[in-house]
Amino acid sequence: MKPSALTLPGYKVNEYLLVLNPHEELRNKIKEVKKEFHDVYKAPTALHGKPHIALVNFLQYAMMEERIINRLKTVAMGFYPFKVELKDFGSFPSHTIFINVTTKEPVRNLVKEMRPFQQLMKLNNDNKPHFIDEPHFTVARKLLPWQYEKGWLEYSQKHFTGRFIADSMLLLRRQAGIPDQPYQILQRLEFMNLPVTTKQGELFG
């Protein structure tokens, strides 16, 4: 994402990505799938990025960071750890191949929890937060037509299974407008399944 015009000169803009991160064994298993796809179809995006489920992607001024983290902490405090099941492959024609998440509802419910404060994630009218309502693990994106067609012909028949317990989400950050810059972990937000009254007491007590 690149910030469009209408940003305040002199103020730093960052790109943020909120994700669910699987355990190391599953991460390595997905990395192997991505590497195999790259070796056969020469798709550079298959090697980019760590395996995760993206929840929301947005641009915002660095000075807003603390307020955003506080709101995300509130969401995480009230949310419960849940099981994420992966099975086989899916695609977004005609550019992306991914690993299916079959337990979509808890992920969608989590994304829904963040919509009420989307104004905090809105840089300006041209840069609004992008909520990901179709949870998945990307194998490769931005594919050329031949890569997609041949790749999907193969991967639509392939099998994959995996599962993990999502007990937290990670807020990642990188400076906006710098291509191919890797994200850094900014904050881990643990799901605590606390009642609302406890949350408010802890935040404002």
Regions found by a protein language model. Give the residues of each.
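Short histidine-centered catalytic/ligand-binding loop motif
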Residues: 97-103
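Short beta-strand segments and strand-loop junctions that repeat across beta-rich extracellular domains
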Residues: 170-177
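Basic, often amphipathic N-terminal segments
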Residues: 1-83, 104-168, 180-205
